């Protein structure tokens, strides 16, 4: 009888959501992304990259530096472990420049055309996506829509945008972001191509504060400058993977124009780097 009472008593207890999990709407998550993007005006960092499967065929280990100025100026430099220069990648607005001194090549063009530049430009396209997790540049655009899905301890935010050349009402999936519901930080992201296939999968780990707390007016502890110091990227095309580990990240200190490099020269003809 006592056992029956205990069982009956247990059955009346409602299932509780796991302690520590936060609730949020799609709009609230989008607001957090905007706050995190606005929190960084400039950034510079030192990192190491480990490469598998020929994603960056010029080296299997790269020591690098990144410079960024909001809203859209970035420079990546890569070196061998003994200090030899491997590459310089500069992005300004919708233009880019890729210099490969060991190969005697300089490629320039528009970001949307990077896929036409062959295997050399692909790793740097992926690197820009990976760095977005540190810079907070994955904010939802004005012409993008969202769908929120609850997946246990995570939220998945699907982001849709207009399909190129299609009617304004026709949209396609652009990317997915997974938020840890304990912290509401983005811990995983997938970029999706026009065919609906995964173009790249990115994992974000080892979050640390890189600056002072954001203005108290936000009233949200997650608005602090918490950024991932470890980024793991899998190329959806099966060309390999890259793991970036930051040694140092400094935010919101003045950068000189020469720190950011420049894009010069005419765009390279498509296919010239294949």
Task: Label every model-predicted segment.
Residues 70-130:
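An acidic-aromatic
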Residues 146-267:
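Gly/Pro-enriched, hydrophobic low-complexity segments
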């Amino acid at each position: 009888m006592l056992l029956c009472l205990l069982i009956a008593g247990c059955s009346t207890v409602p299932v509780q959501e796991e302690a520590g999990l936060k609730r949020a709407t799609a709009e609230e998550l989008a607001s957090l992304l905007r706050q995190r993007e606005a929190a960084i005006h400039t950034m510079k960092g030192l990192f190491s990259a480990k490469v598998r499967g020929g994603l960056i065929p010029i080296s299997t280990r790269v020591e690098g530096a990144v410079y960024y100025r909001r809203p859209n100026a970035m420079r990546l430099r890569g070196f061998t472990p003994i200090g030899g220069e491997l590459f310089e990648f500069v992005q300004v607005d919708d233009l880019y420049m890729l210099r490969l001194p060991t190969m005697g090549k300089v490629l320039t063009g528009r970001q949307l055309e990077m896929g036409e530049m062959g295997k050399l430009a692909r790793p740097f396209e992926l690197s820009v996506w990976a760095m977005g997790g540190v810079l907070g540049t994955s904010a939802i655009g004005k012409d993008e829509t969202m769908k929120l899905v609850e997946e246990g301890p995570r939220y998945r935010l699907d982001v849709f945008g207009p399909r190129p050349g299609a009617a304004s009402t026709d949209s396609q999936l652009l990317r997915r972001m997974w938020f840890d519901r304990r912290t509401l930080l983005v811990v995983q992201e997938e970029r999706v191509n026009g065919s609906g296939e995964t173009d790249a999968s990115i994992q974000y780990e080892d979050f640390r504060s890189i600056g002072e707390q954001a203005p108290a007016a936000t009233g949200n502890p997650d608005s602090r400058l918490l950024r991932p110091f470890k980024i793991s990227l899998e190329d959806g095309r099966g060309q390999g993977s890259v793991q970036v580990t930051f040694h140092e990240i400094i935010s919101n200190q003045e950068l000189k124009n020469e720190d950011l490099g420049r894009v010069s020269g005419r765009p390279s003809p498509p296919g010239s780097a294949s």
